[in-house]
Amino acid sequence: MAYLTRTAAALLATASALLTASPTASATPSPVLARESFDRLPLGPVTEGRDWTSDTSDGTLTVTPASTGHGRELRIRTEGNGRAFVVFPRLAPPGNSFWARMRLRVDAFPTAPDWAHWTLAEASGPDSPTLVRPLGGQYVPTEKRNFYGVGSDLGPTGDWTSWKTSAPAAAGKWSCVEFHLDAIDNRVTVYFDGVPQPDLTVSTDRHGGTADPFVFPTFDKLKLGWQLYQAGPSPSSYDVRMDDIALSTRRVGGCGS
């Protein structure tokens, strides 16, 4: 009887602990909105994965062995002014703010026509036509180089890319890129290999468009990939490699310093 009493007491104590334990740890939502390393996808052409689909025109997405020799990566290829994007269509970030991180390598940037404009990331939402392009750039003929810049289109501030000569776009080199979309002041910040790029920052009243305020839509979609907008570019085709995508309500890190 004493043994049964002790056993019953132990069971009651365990049950009490379970009932009174704070649910905070299990109830706290994960900061991660989406991840994709491509390691679990089959080699070859791909049109969708976990939490993402695709948007292509004169372009393809292909899972290939990683150039590092470990795992797999995504090869993005377009012809002319085609496009090929991984699309996260159900984003819904809390507070309309989020971080993104990815590794990417662009084999070659355009050298013609003058002012050729390209996009690597584009965020949008259903309540506004405004497209937010946190990662893109432009060929600047006066400098004979491509430069990164944050941009936008279709909204009150017009079509603009705020490229900066302090952010040259280097072809054939892997970079770890992060960007943060902060709805508090419609701020976009960019980091290369863990280093902030303050010259690329744009916000409500500091951007490259008209005098109107730059205002985010309510984000529900993010596209990552490549699009060049002008016809007849040189070179005539483009190859981009992308890997280790992470979208989160917090900075993911993993890019070095």
Indicate residue ranges for each PLM-predicted region:
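Extracellular glycan-recognition surfaces and repeat-rich motifs
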Residues: P42-R75
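Secreted extracellular polysaccharide-interacting domains
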Residues: E73-R101, G158-K164
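Glycan-recognition/cleft segments
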Residues: A116-D153
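Secretory targeting and sorting signals
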Residues: M1-T28
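Localized edge beta-strand/strand-to-loop motifs within extracellular or lumenal beta-rich domains
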Residues: K173-T189
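Extracellular carbohydrate-recognition regions
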Residues: P29-S54, D243, S257
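Flexible glycan-contacting loops in extracellular carbohydrate-active proteins
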Residues: T201-V240
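Short, aromatic/His-centered strand-loop micro-motif at the edge of beta-sheets
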Residues: G151-C176
